[in-house]
Design a protein with these regions (language model features):
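A conserved regulatory-domain signal marking ACT and ACT-like small-molecule sensing domains
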Residues: 1-160
């Protein structure tokens, strides 16, 4: 089975680094029916940064606007999900490297039950090219380049 690849957007918000603030933000998203593909948080001095990758960016933007949450867009990346196998992530990184696309970050993990997932972040000016490269690698069996359709055979012209 081939890996599923889709473009994703990353958003960030800073809140006071106090108990239950992250819960308050996340419960607001839950109440709005927002599904998150990824979420992480880190302390930033007296503040805490919450980073999220929503499943539906348009719906997320609408919900945070209505709730008055000050999420800011940060970067664009690619969510890759598939069956676990040795070198699964490396296959995609190799394709990007061959096209001289710099990867600025990777978040990867085992999803359990033989599945894995990763988000690969690239520079904004490389998003379109990376999308083409990753989509092509998703369509080809592992370790092989996509097959190209052979041009139709030409008939030899007859001399009259």
């Amino acid at each position: 089975m081939r890996d599923a690849i889709r473009r994703v957007e990353h958003f960030s918000i800073q809140v006071p680094n106090t108990p239950a603030k992250a819960f308050g933000v996340l419960s607001t998203l839950v109440s709005a029916g927002i599904n998150l593909l990824a979420c992480s948080g880190v302390p930033r001095g007296r503040r805490a940064q919450i980073d999220v990758v929503p499943d539906d960016t348009r719906r997320f933007r609408s919900a945070v606007r209505k709730a008055g949450l000050a999420f800011t867009p940060r970067k664009t990346g690619f969510l890759i999900q598939g069956n676990e196998r040795p070198g699964a992530l490396a296959e995609h990184l190799q394709k990007l490297g061959e096209r001289n696309i710099n990867v600025t970050g990777i978040d990867a993990l085992s999803a359990g039950e033989g599945r894995w997932g990763a988000i690969i972040w690239v520079e904004e000016d490389a998003v379109r090219t990376a999308a083409r490269v990753l989509t092509a690698s998703a369509k080809a069996p592992a370790g092989r380049a996509p097959r190209r359709k052979a041009p139709p055979a030409r008939r030899a012209s007859r001399a009259r």
